[in-house]
Regions:
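Alpha-helical scaffold within the catalytic cores of cyclic-nucleotide enzymes
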Residues: 1-8, 24-66, 70, 91-102
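A short pre-motif secondary-structure segment
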Residues: 10-12
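Short, conserved phosphate-binding/catalytic loop or strand-edge motifs used
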Residues: 14-20
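Cytosolic regulatory/linker segments at or just downstream of nucleotide-handling modules
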Residues: 73, 104-154
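Cytochrome P450 core scaffold surrounding the K-helix E-X-X-R motif
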Residues: 77-79
Length: 154
């Protein structure tokens, strides 16, 4: 799985969304780089799957919206019916979710916040802007690392 390859951990799935965390056993710089690399590779792999399968058999394409943020969180294990489940809570999680929601608004498949860029080893410049996030008082600087959505988005 791509998340494991990039040292991420799947935390939760809900409908067509998933939540992952990076940096549990690495530096903040490695976590930022790994999360960006994972996001870019997910987009590339989905393009390949669209070309080889979904377009061929269903005449459809699927796209993703990925939001990445960095910040302090609470991480723990919860036990439900004898099964341990990792959980991550905090404002940073909420901001990441809002950033993911904003991918449609800004028409870009991968958005990362300024905090992630600052911690990463990325040197090249990317399109950036300010965005107001629902439920968050301050605007956030975001960087668009993905691509525009196709018009026939499924």
């Amino acid at each position: 799985m791509l998340l494991i390859k990039h040292k991420g951990k799947l935390i939760e799935t809900a409908g067509d969304e998933l939540y992952a965390v990076f940096g549990l056993e690495s530096s903040i710089r490695e976590a930022a780089d790994d999360s960006i690399s994972a996001g870019l590779e997910i987009i590339d792999e989905l393009d390949k799957l669209n070309s080889s399968y979904f377009n061929v058999y269903f005449f459809k394409e699927f796209e993703v919206g990925i939001g990445i943020h960095s910040g302090k969180v609470i991480i723990g294990e919860l036990n439900f019916d004898g099964q341990n489940k990792s959980t991550v809570m905090g404002l940073a999680v909420n901001i990441a979710s809002r950033i993911q929601d904003a991918t449609k608004e800004v028409n870009n498949s991968l958005i990362v916040t300024e905090e992630v860029i600052r911690h990463s080893s990325l040197k090249e410049k990317h399109q950036s802007s300010q965005i107001n996030l629902k439920g968050v008082t301050l605007d956030h600087s975001i960087h668009l690392l993905g691509r525009e959505y196709r018009k026939n988005k499924s």
